[in-house]
Swiss-Prot record:
Residues 1-24 are annotated as: Disordered. Homodimer and heterodimers. Belongs to the Casparian strip membrane proteins (CASP) family. The keyword DNA damage does not apply. Keywords: Cell membrane, Membrane, Transmembrane, Transmembrane helix. It comes from Arabidopsis thaliana (Mouse-ear cress). This is CASP-like protein 1D1. It is a multi-pass membrane protein. Residues 52-76, 130-162 are extracellular. GO terms for cellular component: endosome; Golgi apparatus; plasma membrane; trans-Golgi network. It comes from the Eukaryota.
Length: 193
């Protein structure tokens, strides 16, 4: 009987919220994922901002310069850059907050709740920006016959590759944010349990 009580107490101590290796590994996982989020959002922003391409059409006589393709031509792509900039800034702030809490070996329930809420908000923002950018990219690639919007990717190939790459990295950032959101909620659950 005495042996069972000791065993139960040891088990409760090792699984108590805020103790043990689970919380440490969870915090370290959050730090790593937040750094990966920073790298992904920054990469996506840089690729999108550097996507400008200018083309000249050569007809007999004189070359004609057609308008440059750049992200500022589309409100959806501007939203994409702004949303990812917000997520990039959030990743910097949340990484510092998480590292600070990790160094103190104490992560309050209020901090975990704030991280869980903000991670969920950022998932929505980045996912919506990825969808908006993806819609514009699809129109550029395939066009829309019903409203007579032509394809542009056969003309602006470099621009379309940049936009596609930025959207792919942004989709990866959305998955990282989703994982962070799940980890934040699980950490909060373990803390208040």
């Amino acid at each position: 009987m005495g042996y069972e009580t000791k065993s139960t107490l040891d088990t409760e101590r090792s699984t108590a919220p805020g103790t043990g290796t689970t919380t440490k590994s969870c915090s370290m996982t959050q730090v790593v994922l937040r750094f990966v989020l920073f790298a992904a959002t920054l990469t996506s922003i840089v690729v999108m901002v550097t996507s400008k391409q200018t083309k000249n059409i050569f007809l007999p006589g004189t070359p004609i310069r057609i308008p440059a393709a750049e992200f500022t031509n589309s409100p959806a792509l501007i939203y994409f850059v702004v949303a990812l900039s917000v997520a990039c800034f959030y990743s910097i702030v949340s990484t510092f907050v998480t590292v600070s809490a990790f160094k103190k070996h104490s992560c309050s329930a209020v901090l975990l709740l704030n991280l869980a809420i903000m991670d969920a908000v950022m998932v929505g923002i980045v996912a919506s920006a990825t969808g908006a950018g993806g819609g514009v990219a699809y129109l550029g690639l395939k066009g829309n016959k019903e409203v007579r919007w032509g394809k542009i990717c056969h003309i602006y190939d470099k621009f379309c590759r940049h936009v596609g790459g930025a959207i792919a990295v942004s989709l990866f950032a959305s998955v990282v944010l989703l994982l962070l959101s799940i980890i934040s909620v699980l950490s909060l659950y373990k803390k208040i349990r």
